[in-house]
């Protein structure tokens, strides 16, 4: 993570911006689903940050964290619930493959969307966009 921002710093002029969008462990989904959290996504993610750790990283690498936008959606729920039940994202039973053939009703999906919206408002969604500005 530090090396990425160091590389970005070399590419940006002072005042230049960088957007990094990542899953975050300071989220309801991580706390609720643990190893079944769909965004854990091993081995693609070698390290997962919290809101606090990305703030600290920005300071250490001499960036100003301009904004954090939580932008999670219902995927954090249906993907994690599928993993809990042993259903992969590529399964014919997956909501991502066949919404009409999935284990979730439209009512459940609506509740997932509403919960995601509320979690984003509370900065508790499972992913966020971080806007870094080079000092």
Which role does the model predict for each range below?
Residues 18-47, 52-59, 83:
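Short, glycine-/aromatic-enriched active-site segment of Class I SAM-dependent methyltransferases
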Residues 3, 49, 114:
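Short, conserved clusters of charged catalytic residues that mark active-site
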Residues 20, 65-70:
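Acidic/polar loop patches that form or flank catalytic/metal-binding clefts of enzymes
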Residues 1-2, 29-32, 67-68, 77-78:
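Extended hydrophobic-aromatic, low-complexity segments
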Residues 11-13, 57, 61-63, 134:
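A structural motif corresponding to the C-terminal end of an alpha-helix
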Residues 2-19:
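A short glycine-rich, Lys/Arg-flanked "PGG" loop and its adjoining helix->strand segment in the class I
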Residues 70-135:
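A C-terminal cap/extension of S-adenosyl-L-methionine-dependent methyltransferases
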């Amino acid at each position: 993570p530090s090396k990425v921002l160091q590389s970005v710093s070399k590419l940006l002029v002072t005042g230049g911006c960088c957007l990094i969008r990542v899953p975050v462990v300071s989220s309801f989904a991580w706390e609720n689903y643990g190893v079944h959290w769909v965004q854990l996504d091993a081995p693609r993610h070698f390290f997962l940050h919290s809101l606090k750790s990305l703030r600290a990283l920005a300071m250490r690498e001499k960036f100003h964290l301009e904004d954090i936008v939580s932008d999670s959606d219902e995927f954090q729920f249906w993907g994690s619930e599928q993993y809990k039940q042993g259903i992969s994202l590529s399964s014919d039973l997956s909501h991502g493959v066949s919404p009409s053939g999935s284990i979730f009703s439209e009512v459940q999906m609506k509740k997932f969307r509403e919960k995601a919206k509320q979690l984003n408002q509370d900065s508790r969604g499972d992913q966020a966009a971080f806007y870094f500005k080079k000092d």
